[in-house]
């Protein structure tokens, strides 16, 4: 069977080595004669897995000791509400920076739970010569007392990424669902990081939360127990039965990434992949991208065909060539190639070759 390259934005492709290992031990994990899906989450074997997973993640991201690492339910949207409920209380205020669809969704959830009087927002995307560009505000000039400022460094729908570190007088809460471990960051700059697993970590159903200890002292709203960070810390992410298979696969992905040399190594590969694809887009007037170069996403490359009537043919022929899930989000249309950690350079090279051939045929 010829290679299939899956460019889905999420759930995304997993490393082939991880999938093969999971396949090999699906029915007999750790020599127990049963699947990892069937063992107790409180058994010594699974507890050992969780401890190793946390240790590996801490090593990969250089997480300081005053941060807790949580493996939780609910994905990114679950964290939209959890952040508000855990940190705002009845009087606290927060600032949301809006750069695209996912930061807008986080803002909407915060407004729903806390109301407009507690939630402020700033749109940080402007048009520069017809292209989307991020303009970060000077937060130190804002006269307000916020519990936190929330932002999403990478917008998967819009193909926008913020590479500059945010400078804030208030704790920073960041949705890193699509960029976690794709490039190095300084975790100590953040009050809380959350990430749905289904892009760079594992299958859907799991979310990673990295929270600084002092954030847990903020007043909280009444909320469901399973989304309470304090209870999650107290019970080692096992207040209730966790998504064990997703946790297992996340652990395997962490081990795989370590075997490649860690985040610094994969970051170089990710940069190569993005540069290769954007070079193809820029070199050919048949394709266009709507984001300034400084804010083009490395993880989610969005582009349009000069002739939209060819979109269907492009997708059909791409799929026949083993290049799947390239259709853009329904909100923006066009095409989108997601280049998460598991996507090999060969997959991007195959896409570029196809795009050049398609453009030559239809120009």
Swiss-Prot record:
Pathway: Amino-acid biosynthesis; L-serine biosynthesis; L-serine from 3-phospho-D-glycerate: step 2/3; Cofactor biosynthesis; pyridoxine 5'-phosphate biosynthesis; pyridoxine 5'-phosphate from D-erythrose 4-phosphate: step 3/5. L-glutamate binds at residue 42. Keywords: Amino-acid biosynthesis, Aminotransferase, Cytoplasm, Pyridoxal phosphate, Pyridoxine biosynthesis, Serine biosynthesis, Transferase. Belongs to the class-V pyridoxal-phosphate-dependent aminotransferase family. SerC subfamily. It comes from Shewanella sp. (strain MR-4). The gene is serC. InterPro entries: Aminotrans_V_dom, Aminotrans_V_PyrdxlP_BS, Pser_aminoTfrase, PyrdxlP-dep_Trfase, PyrdxlP-dep_Trfase_major, PyrdxlP-dep_Trfase_small. Pfam families: Aminotran_5. The keyword Iron-sulfur does not apply. Catalyzes the reversible conversion of 3-phosphohydroxypyruvate to phosphoserine and of 3-hydroxy-2-oxo-4-phosphonooxybutanoate to phosphohydroxythreonine. It is found in: Cytoplasm. This is Phosphoserine aminotransferase. It comes from the Bacteria. It catalyses: O-phospho-L-serine + 2-oxoglutarate = 3-phosphooxypyruvate + L-glutamate; 4-(phosphooxy)-L-threonine + 2-oxoglutarate = (R)-3-hydroxy-2-oxo-4-phosphooxybutanoate + L-glutamate. Pyridoxal 5'-phosphate binds at residues 76-77, 102, 156, 175, 198, 240-241. HAMAP family: SerC_aminotrans_5 (MF_00160). Its cofactor is pyridoxal 5'-phosphate. The modification N6-(pyridoxal phosphate)lysine is found at residue 199. Its EC number is 2.6.1.52. The keyword Iron does not apply.
């Amino acid at each position: 069977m010829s290679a299939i390259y899956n460019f889905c934005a999420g759930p995304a492709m997993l490393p082939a080595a991880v999938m093969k290992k999971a396949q090999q031990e699906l029915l007999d994990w750790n020599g127990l004669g049963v699947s990892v899906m069937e063992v107790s989450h409180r058994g010594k074997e699974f507890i050992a897995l969780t401890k190793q997973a946390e240790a590996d993640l801490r090593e990969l991201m250089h997480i300081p000791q005053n941060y807790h690492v949580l493996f939780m339910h609910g994905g990114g949207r679950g964290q939209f509400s959890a952040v508000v409920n855990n940190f705002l209380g009845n009087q606290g205020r927060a600032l949301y920076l809006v750069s695209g669809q996912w930061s807008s969704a986080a803002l909407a959830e915060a407004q729903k739970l806390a109301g407009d009087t507690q939630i402020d927002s700033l749109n940080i995307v402007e048009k520069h010569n017809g292209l989307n560009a991020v303009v970060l505000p000077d937060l130190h000039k804002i006269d307000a007392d916020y519990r936190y400022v929330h932002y999403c460094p990478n917008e998967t729908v819009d193909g926008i990424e913020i590479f500059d570190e945010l400078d804030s007088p208030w704790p920073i809460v960041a949705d890193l669902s699509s960029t976690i471990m794709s490039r190095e960051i300084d975790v100590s700059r953040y009050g809380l990081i959350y990430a749905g697993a289904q892009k760079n970590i594992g299958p859907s159903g799991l979310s990673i939360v990295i929270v600084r200890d002092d954030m847990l002292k903020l007043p909280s709203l009444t909320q469901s127990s399973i989304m309470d960070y304090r209870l999650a810390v107290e019970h080692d992410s096992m207040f209730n039965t966790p998504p064990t298979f997703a946790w297992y696969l996340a652990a395997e992905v962490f081990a795989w990434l370590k075997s490649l040399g860690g985040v610094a190594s994969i970051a170089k590969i990710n940069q190569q992949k993005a540069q290769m694809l954007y070079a193809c887009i820029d070199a050919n007037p048949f394709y266009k991208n709507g984001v300034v170069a400084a804010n083009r996403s490395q993880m989610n490359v969005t582009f349009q065909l000069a002739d939209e009537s060819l979109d269907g043919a492009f997708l059909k022929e791409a799929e026949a060539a083993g290049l799947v899930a390239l259709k853009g989000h329904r909100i923006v249309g066009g095409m989108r190639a997601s280049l998460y950690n598991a996507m090999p350079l060969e997959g991007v090279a195959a896409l570029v070759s196809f795009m050049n051939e398609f453009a030559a045929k239809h120009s």
